[in-house]
C-alpha cells in the first residue's frame, strides 16, 4: 500500500462528498488509489450515510491518505460537504470530485504536471469522458465537458450550456482562499456553474489543457424523470434562485450585456420544467423573477406562457410548449451540433 510521508503536506487534496451508494463510492475510491501519482489526500465527506455504508468504506482508511469526515453542520447537501472539505484540505492544489464517477490512473499526475508548468494560472480545465456501465467512453455525443469549444465561457454558463464542471479542473488552493470562494448551499442545481462563475468573476486565471480525457462522468440510464425532479417545489425554487443569482452577478460586472444569454438559460429551464403542461403558479414565479432583472425579457416570457396556454387547447402539450420557442430551440440544436463537431478527444 502506498502512503505519503506523514511529515509532509499532500500536494493535492481531493474533496468528495458522498451519501450511501457504497459500491459506487468504493469504485471511485479504488480509481483514486490506482493513480500513479501518490502525493494526495482524499477528504471523503459523509453527508449522513447509513452505518452499513460507513462500515463498508471504513477499510479504505487503512491508507492514511484516505480520510472520512462526518458532516455535523447544516444544511445537508453536497455544497455543505464541499465547504467542510475546503476547511480541512491541506493540499497545494484542490480537485472536487463526485463519489460515483471515475478517475483514470494518470488523472491526478497529469493535472499537477500541467498546472505546475503554468505558474500564471489559478486553475486549469481538463477534458472529460462519460462512464457508462463501468466503461470509459471519450467519444460520447453529449455530457462531455472541458474542451475549449465555446467562444465565451461566461456566455455558455449563462445559457446553462456548461463549458466545464468543477471536476474538470484543478485549482490552486491559495487562489480559492484569496478570492474567498465558497459553495452556495441554497443551490440544488447548477452548483458547479455557480462556483466556476464565481471564480471567473473573482479574476481567477485559467486555461484549457489539450490532453486525453482523464475523468469519467458516470451516466445512469434508469434515473427518474428529469422534468418531475426539476419541477418539484424545492428544486424549482432553487433553479429560480440560480437564475436570479446569475442575473445579479453578471449585471454587477457587465451591465445588461449577458441578459439575453441568461434568458436563454431560463428558456432551457422552462422547456424542462413544463414538459407535462404549464403550472400557472410556477410560470408566474418565473416571469416575475425575470422581470425583476430585465423587463424586456420578462415580457417576452409572459407572452410565451400566454401563447402556450392558448395552444394547449388545440395542440399536444409538448407542441404547445415548444412552438412559441422555436427560434431558441433551433439555435440550441445548432450550437449542440457545432460543439460536437469541435470536440475531438485526443487518443
Predicted segments, located by residue:
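Short, well-formed alpha-helical segments that are part of the catalytic scaffolds
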Residues: 20-34
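Glycine-rich, basic loop-to-helix element that forms the pyrophosphate-binding segment
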Residues: 72-89
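Conserved donor NDP-sugar-binding/catalytic core segment of glycosyltransferases
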Residues: 106-139
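Catalytic core of nucleotide-sugar-dependent glycosyltransferases
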Residues: 214-223, 228-256, 277-295
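Membrane-interface aromatic/basic loop that binds lipid-linked glycans or pyrophosphate carriers
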Residues: 2, 275-347
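Conserved nucleotide-sugar donor-binding catalytic segment
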Residues: 151-232
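A conserved acidic beta->alpha catalytic loop
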Residues: 31, 38, 46-56, 75, ...
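Short aromatic/hydrophobic "clamp" motif used to bind/position activated sugar donors
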Residues: 94
Amino acid at each position: 500500500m502506498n502512503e505519503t510521508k506523514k511529515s509532509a503536506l499532500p500536494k493535492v487534496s481531493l474533496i468528495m462528498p458522498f451519501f450511501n451508494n457504497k459500491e459506487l463510492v468504493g469504485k471511485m475510491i479504488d480509481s483514486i488509489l490506482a493513480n500513479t501519482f501518490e502525493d494526495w489526500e482524499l477528504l471523503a465527506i459523509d453527508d449522513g450515510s447509513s452505518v452499513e455504508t460507513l462500515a463498508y468504506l471504513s477499510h479504505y482508511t487503512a491508507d492514511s491518505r484516505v480520510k472520512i469526515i462526518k458532516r455535523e453542520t447544516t444544511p445537508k447537501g453536497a455544497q455543505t460537504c464541499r465547504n467542510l472539505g475546503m476547511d480541512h484540505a491541506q493540499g497545494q492544489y484542490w480537485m472536487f470530485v463526485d463519489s460515483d464517477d471515475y478517475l483514470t490512473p494518470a488523472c491526478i499526475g497529469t493535472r499537477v504536471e500541467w498546472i505546475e508548468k503554468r505558474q500564471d494560472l489559478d486553475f486549469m480545465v481538463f477534458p472529460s469522458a462519460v462512464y457508462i456501465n463501468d466503461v470509459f467512453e471519450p467519444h460520447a455525443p453529449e455530457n462531455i465537458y472541458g474542451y475549449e469549444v465555446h467562444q465565451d465561457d461566461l456566455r455558455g454558463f449563462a445559457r446553462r450550456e456548461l463549458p466545464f464542471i468543477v471536476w474538470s479542473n484543478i485549482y490552486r488552493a491559495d487562489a480559492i482562499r484569496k478570492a474567498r470562494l465558497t459553495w452556495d448551499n441554497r443551490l440544488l442545481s447548477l452548483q458547479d456553474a455557480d462556483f466556476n462563475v464565481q471564480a471567473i468573476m473573482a479574476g481567477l486565471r485559467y486555461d484549457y489543457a489539450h490532453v486525453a480525457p482523464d475523468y469519467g462522468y458516470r451516466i445512469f440510464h434508469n434515473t427518474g424523470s428529469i422534468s418531475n425532479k426539476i419541477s418539484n417545489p424545492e428544486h424549482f425554487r432553487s433553479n429560480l434562485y440560480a437564475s436570479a443569482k446569475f442575473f445579479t452577478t453578471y449585471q454587477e460586472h457587465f451591465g445588461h450585456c449577458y441578459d439575453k444569454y441568461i434568458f436563454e438559460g431560463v428558456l432551457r429551464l422552462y422547456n424542462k420544467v413544463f414538459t407535462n403542461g404549464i403550472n400557472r403558479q410556477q410560470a408566474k414565479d418565473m416571469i416575475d423573477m425575470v422581470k425583476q432583472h430585465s423587463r424586456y425579457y420578462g415580457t417576452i416570457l409572459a407572452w410565451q406562457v400566454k401563447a402556450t396556454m392558448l395552444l394547449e387547447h388545440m395542440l399536444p402539450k409538448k407542441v404547445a410548449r415548444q412552438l412559441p420557442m422555436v427560434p431558441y430551440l433551433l439555435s440550441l440544436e445548432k450550437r449542440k451540433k457545432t460543439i460536437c463537431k469541435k470536440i475531438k478527444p485526443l487518443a
